Amino acid sequence: MRKLPVCVLMIPLLLAGCGGAGSKAEETALEIRSACMSASACTGSAEITADYGQRVYRYQMDFQAGQKETVLTLTGPDTVAGVVARLTNEGESLLEYDGAVLETGPLNEDGLTPVSAIPAVLNAARQGYLETCTLEEREGREELRMLIRDPEQPLGQGLESSLWFDTQTQSLLRAELCQDGFCVIQCQFSQFTMEQEETQVK
């Protein structure tokens, strides 16, 4: 008998708030979430904008997110290009390279920073509670928008993540992380790929 991984069995629960049963948006979200959960690694490039209210930071980086750690290589701006961070599941906000230190500080009480944004986005895609999922048209392309949030918080409160995926390629296109209704992180992704593990069915 084939045994399904627990993570696969949990998918319907994590889609509980997503549209009507059997809708195209729900089916697409199920397929994309399943791919995210079964991926052994995600790679790509991202442009991160972090809004601290009085300060706005912009970074460009390449990333490789595995099951145990995420490796980020900053490519811009020039003052921090070449900085490399290795983040565990707990995440870090301190980067060191040749004695230089970059510390931007947390954006919320949970310690969200520009450095931890990519792990936070991928974690939301894999296992966050899906409040809604809708299909949108943008520049002639069909996209799936996922709104992921804490179901115990009122709408617009706490951390809410909006993720957009290309429905054809399942590539992550962009993301917005909002804290109490204020957008603190924006991510624009390119060359996003998910590497799938090869499994044998007995």
Model-found features: residue ranges?
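Gly/Pro-enriched, hydrophobic low-complexity segments
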Residues: 131-202
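An acidic-aromatic
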Residues: 64-119
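Hydrophobic lipid-interacting interfaces of membrane-associated proteins
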Residues: 49-51, 77-79, 100, 180-182
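N-terminal leader/targeting segments and the immediate start of mature chains
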Residues: 17-64, 68, 198-202
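Sec-dependent bacterial lipoprotein signal peptides
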Residues: 1-16
